[in-house]
Regions:
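Active-site neighborhoods and metal-handling regions in enzymes and metal-associated proteins
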Residues: 1-451
Length: 451
């Protein structure tokens, strides 16, 4: 679209009959206009950019990041002898194409999917008239309207829609698979599985492909993650400023949402904020409870921020201009010590089993209330691996080896069984060639550190 058209197209246009052949030309002009106004093309805004400049974090090379991700996917597909991958998880589609469309809605309404050929094109099946939403990335070779066969669209005729959908997928596999009819699929309902099998297409575990592809982050991905964490921590600062006696948990949680969206972030996965007696046991969702002076306020961000990266941090604050009680100080010290000790253990070459066996755990009167995991991977969301306490390790817990480029979250929850309050702390840590680097920087509450 020329520069003059970019700013004025469609603003004063009158409805009139099209001349023969004009519709497709206009459609392409509309698509180019819409692509240039896509939120990914417009960027994250001056609030976020100014904070990133102040933090000294350079912009990631998004083209290099996208190429790296596609190569990671195709390496896994080749290693596992697949002709391609059929992806429904919106986060996997984001990883493959760096495009988004109604991410939460399509997570529970499968109306958008993507086929990544091991040696061939990326074909994105998107919501109707959404071709412009992937043009910015340069990764998608073709956009087609998706055939959705969820009951919302198909009703009692779903079986017919499944056949139409499967025929298109099978044709792609035969056209680009070089005779290989095996594909990896991340999420698929049984009707689709059965129909693809009837057409001779063999299915394998697409989650294994994508989780292993996403495991090792490129330098540009780490830059994007650093920026997401800076944005998250800026929103946390606004949240802490708003923390006064009398504010509701819901109002406080809304500050984190507002700060994330204002900086070009995307959504928050959970509602994990609790105060006072609601901090023990953990996993209360935030509520209308009014926070009181002297309360612990504990939260887990679980935030999908700028660039789609997860900033997964936890903090526990003390509400009001007060000093902590001895019990609060002791609980906080136990959690902070556990995080500090377990972070020092993270380095390349350590096995998952070795890591958990060396890890510090809650004391006996808090152990029954322990958090479900000691560590977990993180990237575009919580990712593989998830590492439990040593005593929770079972014969179906996968072992592995820590590698440079992985990012782990280190978890601690300390609350006595039957106690009044509890402490949640979580840090995000990059594994480097020689050890680790803590990516999260938000300070702990100084009053609680001092005890």
């Amino acid at each position: 679209v020329n520069d003059a058209l970019k700013g004025t197209f469609g603003r004063h246009r009158k409805i009139m009959p099209f001349e023969s052949g004009s519709v497709e030309a206009l459609r392409q002009t509309v698509r180019a206009k819409a692509a240039g106004l896509n939120r990914h093309s417009l960027g994250h805004g001056e609030i976020a950019e100014s904070e990133w400049r102040a933090a000294g974090i350079a912009a990631p090379d998004l083209e290099a990041m996208r190429r790296y991700r596609l190569e990671r996917i195709r390496t896994e597909l080749k290693r596992r002898d697949y002709a391609g991958a059929l992806l429904y998880d919106p986060i996997n589609i984001r990883y493959a194409t760096d495009s988004t469309n109604m991410q939460l809605w399509v997570a529970h309404n499968p109306t958008r999917h993507c086929f990544v050929a091991t040696d061939g094109p990326i074909v994105l099946f998107d919501y109707f008239s959404c071709e412009h939403l992937s043009d910015h990335s340069g990764m998608v070779d073709e956009v087609r309207p998706a055939v959705s066969w969820i009951y919302l669209y198909g009703g009692e005729l779903t079986e017919k829609r499944v056949r139409r959908w499967a025929s298109e997928i099978a044709d792609l596999v035969r056209q680009h698979g070089g005779g290989n009819l095996r594909i990896a699929v991340d999420h698929l309902d049984p009707e689709g599985t059965a129909e693809l099998a009837r057409l001779g297409i063999s299915l394998g575990n697409g989650e294994a492909v994508m989780e292993n592809a996403r495991l090792i982050k490129s330098p540009d991905e780490i830059l994007a993650m650093r920026r997401a964490i800076v944005a998250c921590e800026a929103a946390m600062r606004e949240m802490e400023t708003a923390l006064k006696p009398g504010i509701s948990e819901n109002e406080l949680w809304a500050e984190l949402h507002r700060g994330n969206i204002a900086r070009g972030g995307e959504w928050i996965e959970t509602r994990l904020l609790a105060s006072g007696p609601r901090t023990n046991p953990w996993f209360q969702e935030c509520s209308a409870r009014l926070v009181e002076a002297g309360d612990f306020v504990a939260f887990d961000t679980d935030l999908i921020g700028p660039y789609g990266f997860c900033a997964d941090l936890s903090r526990t604050w003390l509400c009001g201009d007060v000093r902590p009680t001895p019990e609060q100080g002791e609980l906080f010290a136990l959690a902070a010590d556990q995080i500090a000790h377990n972070t020092t253990l993270i380095k390349p070459g350590v096995t998952f089993r070795e890591l958990v066996e060396r890890s510090q755990v809650p004391p006996s009167d808090c152990f029954a209330n322990r958090y479900g995991v000691l560590y977990h991977g993180v990237g575009l969301a919580d990712e593989y691996p998830t590492l439990p306490h040593a005593m929770d390790w079972t014969d179906d817990t996968p072992d592995g080896v820590l590698q440079a480029g992985m990012v782990l979250c280190v978890e601690s929850y300390i609350g006595r069984l039957g106690g009044h309050e509890g402490v949640k702390i979580e840090e995000q840590v990059l594994i480097t060639e020689i050890g680790n680097e803590k990516l999260s920087n938000y300070p702990l509450d100084e009053r609680l550190i001092a005890g």
